[in-house]
Amino acid sequence: MLTVTAPAKVNLHLEVLGLRSDGFHELAMVMQSIDLADSLQFTNTADAQITLRCDDSSLSTGADNLVLKAAELLRARSGFNELGVSMYLEKRIPIGAGLAGGSSDGAAALVGLNALWGLGYTAEALESMAAELGSDMPFCVAGGTQLCFGRGELLEPVPPTAEGLAVLLVKDPLVSVSTPWAYQRCKELKGKNYLEGEVAFEQRRRDLREAPWLQPLRAGCPPPLRNDLQVVVAAETQAVQVSLQLLQTLPTPLAVAMSGSGPSCFALFGDQDQCDQAAADLSPKLKAAGLKAWACSLRSDGVRIAS
């Protein structure tokens, strides 16, 4: 049996630049892996069947699941149609949370099955396959701190931080946000201000590459945590409003923001002790508001084989 960990991500920067010719939004982002992670277990089978079970009954384990899509794609590319696997997913990342849980699980399937089946694909080849399945999936393969451009699939690594930065995540377990809805609503509300053309897009990419807070990520020059979807989603999602308000009452965070398309929100701290203390201090108010919380350190890697 093989086990792969699949970490969540937060967006330290999410800038919606404009619309591409293919209808997708052109993005300029900084994504960061954190140590809240799912676990995907693999067992070889001799029946050419690919199956998935999960400890969370609310998650579909049918053909729409990215784990199965990734497994089918990898087997098809290998040409070895006799390969089979039984997979078991332990969910720890909340579903529909803006934390790339599904994408990370799909990336874990690519990495794990590449090893289990002895296919020998490089990380770059796996990232390329991941991009066919989801915009966040290449990042989940690579992990750490990455500049993410295009739809999010074009990666440029950022120097790893030597500091023990941490995040306090909060989410209402009863609320999820549709990513397509969030981007459509963003276009409706902000489309008239979108940039147009590759020259304008590249200037914003260059500005982000040269941002002083990425040289490297550190507490002394914290990221401003821009998220262009935050104002759009928060306006229509009370759970996001409440989460941000509670996090903003804390005395020591470096910055506060929503992650991805939400509804998860987080506060960034200079070290894990401050983060843990904030989680303890805020716990009664979070419980009263029906919010769950996770105090997480930052990771320098993406999905990884654990055993």
UniProtKB/Swiss-Prot annotation:
EC number annotated for this UniProt entry: 2.7.1.148
Protein task: Catalyzes the phosphorylation of the position 2 hydroxy group of 4-diphosphocytidyl-2C-methyl-D-erythritol.
Pathway annotation: Isoprenoid biosynthesis; isopentenyl diphosphate biosynthesis via DXP pathway; isopentenyl diphosphate from 1-deoxy-D-xylulose 5-phosphate: step 3/6
Any GO BP: isopentenyl diphosphate biosynthetic process, methylerythritol 4-phosphate pathway
Name this polypeptide is given: 4-diphosphocytidyl-2-C-methyl-D-erythritol kinase
Gene3D superfamilies per record: 3.30.230.10, GHMP kinase, C-terminal domain
Active site (record annotation): K9, D136
Keywords linked to the UniProt accession: ATP-binding, Isoprene biosynthesis, Kinase, Nucleotide-binding, Transferase
Binding-site list for ATP: P94, I95, G96, A97, G98, L99, A100, G101, G102, S103, S104
Organism encoding this protein: Synechococcus sp. (strain CC9902)
Reaction catalysis annotation: 4-CDP-2-C-methyl-D-erythritol + ATP = 4-CDP-2-C-methyl-D-erythritol 2-phosphate + ADP + H(+)
Pfam families: GHMP_kinases_C, GHMP_kinases_N
